[in-house]
């Protein structure tokens, strides 16, 4: 009976009706032939064959009756009755998801998320980004506000006190002089007063005098360290307790060439044994080009007494006026003033 099915199926499918009263196919054979004919139509049309047509036909127990062309209604209508887990992939060793619209997040056992999956994902909105660290918030880049440019107008911010026990710093900013002054009574004061040395030496100007002074008070309460430019004539920034002294160039000394020394004349028992020499012109170009920090890094401390230079100081202050006249003849530059005073512990 099975061997004659291919030859008899062609006339039946093509429209040929066999003689009535003869049982040609069973219900299972007829359903399988219809399925194969439908697959053939998909192949001829060039359309992908649906997966349901590729599933094997499992006959129902009630469909055991023989199909007869004489009484087609006698046989029940055949349906594909499949268990949800029994599918094409289960037949070939793989399991097809019976609920593809459902989120696939499971605990590995029986529980499964009941929400619908996202159209572009296998998971719902809650479980789409479960693998990522959701506790970490996105970092927003904060743009720093640009620093305001210095204005030519005079702006002074001063906070000072004259209490010797608890000195407070003071900050002073001038119009053409951009200065930083931190100091108070009873504290050491560091003062740097110089124009833009980098621009000066880049233009080929020559430094006439490299000035470096160190003042040491008898009481030890106030100490000043000052660096002044050749074009600056403002000596008011020196500590009030330290009087200015004339300048003289030593004849024969072990210091660097072009070096000048200043000192506060003290009693012999209070005289410090520290000598600070300025740098040469070539060293000044490198140090002043890099800023005041480079100048301080190259200061040479020598353990030589200052007594041999005391006798060489001028007895009068006329040299100061001559120095001011020489500076007035030179080209004036905008002065940049930096004054820092650091509290020093009192030495008994």
From Swiss-Prot:
<dbReference type="GO" id="GO:0005634">
    <property type="term" value="C:nucleus"/>
</dbReference>
<feature type="short sequence motif" description="Bipartite nuclear localization signal">
    <location>
        <begin position="130"/>
        <end position="137"/>
    </location>
</feature>
<feature type="region of interest" description="Disordered">
    <location>
        <begin position="125"/>
        <end position="165"/>
    </location>
</feature>
<dbReference type="InterPro" id="IPR031137">
    <property type="entry name" value="GRF"/>
</dbReference>
<feature type="short sequence motif" description="Bipartite nuclear localization signal">
    <location>
        <begin position="94"/>
        <end position="112"/>
    </location>
</feature>
<dbReference type="GO" id="GO:0032502">
    <property type="term" value="P:developmental process"/>
</dbReference>
<feature type="compositionally biased region" description="Basic residues">
    <location>
        <begin position="127"/>
        <end position="136"/>
    </location>
</feature>
<protein>
    <recommendedName>
        <fullName>Growth-regulating factor 5</fullName>
    </recommendedName>
</protein>
<feature type="compositionally biased region" description="Basic and acidic residues">
    <location>
        <begin position="306"/>
        <end position="320"/>
    </location>
</feature>
<dbReference type="GO" id="GO:0006355">
    <property type="term" value="P:regulation of DNA-templated transcription"/>
</dbReference>
<comment type="similarity">
    <text>Belongs to the GRF family.</text>
</comment>
<feature type="domain" description="QLQ">
    <location>
        <begin position="24"/>
        <end position="59"/>
    </location>
</feature>
<keyword id="KW-0805">Transcription regulation</keyword>
<feature type="compositionally biased region" description="Polar residues">
    <location>
        <begin position="329"/>
        <end position="340"/>
    </location>
</feature>
<keyword id="KW-0539">Nucleus</keyword>
<feature type="domain" description="WRC">
    <location>
        <begin position="97"/>
        <end position="141"/>
    </location>
</feature>
<dbReference type="Pfam" id="PF08879">
    <property type="entry name" value="WRC"/>
</dbReference>
<dbReference type="InterPro" id="IPR014978">
    <property type="entry name" value="Gln-Leu-Gln_QLQ"/>
</dbReference>
<dbReference type="GO" id="GO:0006351">
    <property type="term" value="P:DNA-templated transcription"/>
</dbReference>
<dbReference type="InterPro" id="IPR014977">
    <property type="entry name" value="WRC_dom"/>
</dbReference>
<keyword id="KW-0804">Transcription</keyword>
<dbReference type="Pfam" id="PF08880">
    <property type="entry name" value="QLQ"/>
</dbReference>
<feature type="region of interest" description="Disordered">
    <location>
        <begin position="306"/>
        <end position="348"/>
    </location>
</feature>
<dbReference type="GO" id="GO:0005524">
    <property type="term" value="F:ATP binding"/>
</dbReference>
<comment type="function">
    <text>Transcription activator that plays a regulatory role in gibberellin-induced stem elongation.</text>
</comment>
<feature type="compositionally biased region" description="Polar residues">
    <location>
        <begin position="148"/>
        <end position="161"/>
    </location>
</feature>
<keyword id="KW-0010">Activator</keyword>
């Amino acid at each position: 009976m099975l061997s004659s099915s291919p030859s008899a199926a062609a006339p039946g499918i093509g429209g040929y009706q066999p003689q009535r009263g003869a049982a040609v196919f069973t219900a299972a054979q007829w359903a399988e032939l219809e399925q194969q004919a439908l697959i053939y139509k998909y192949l001829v049309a060039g359309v992908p064959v649906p997966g349901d047509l590729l599933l094997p036909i499992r006959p129902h127990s009630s469909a055991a009756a023989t199909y007869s062309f004489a009484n087609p209604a006698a046989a029940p209508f055949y349906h594909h009755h499949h268990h949800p887990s029994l599918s094409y992939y289960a037949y070939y060793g793989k399991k097809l998801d019976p609920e593809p619209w459902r989120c696939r997040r499971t605990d590995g056992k029986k529980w499964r998320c009941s929400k619908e999956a996202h159209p572009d994902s296998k998971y719902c909105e809650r479980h789409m980004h479960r693998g990522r660290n959701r506790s970490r918030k996105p970092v927003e880049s904060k743009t720093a506000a640009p620093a305001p440019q210095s204005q030519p107008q005079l702006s002074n911010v001063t906070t000072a006190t004259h209490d010797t026990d608890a000195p407070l710093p003071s900050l002073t900013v001038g119009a053409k002089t951009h200065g930083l002054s931190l100091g108070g009574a009873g504290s050491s004061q560091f003062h740097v007063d110089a124009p833009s040395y980098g621009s000066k030496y880049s233009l080929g100007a020559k430094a006439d005098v490299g000035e470096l002074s160190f003042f040491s008070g008898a009481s030890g309460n106030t100490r000043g360290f000052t660096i002044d430019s050749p074009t600056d004539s403002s000596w008011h920034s020196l500590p009030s307790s330290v009087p200015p002294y004339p300048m003289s160039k030593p004849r024969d000394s072990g210091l660097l060439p072009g070096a000048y020394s200043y000192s506060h004349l003290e009693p012999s028992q209070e005289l410090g044994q520290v000598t600070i020499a300025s740098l040469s012109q070539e060293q000044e170009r490198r140090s002043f080009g890099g800023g005041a920090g480079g100048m301080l890094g190259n200061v040479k401390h020598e353990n030589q007494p200052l007594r041999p230079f005391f006798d060489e100081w001028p007895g009068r202050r006329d040299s100061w006026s001559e120095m001011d006249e020489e500076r007035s003849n030179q080209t004036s530059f905008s002065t940049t003033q930096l004054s820092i005073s650091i509290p020093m512990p009192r030495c008994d």
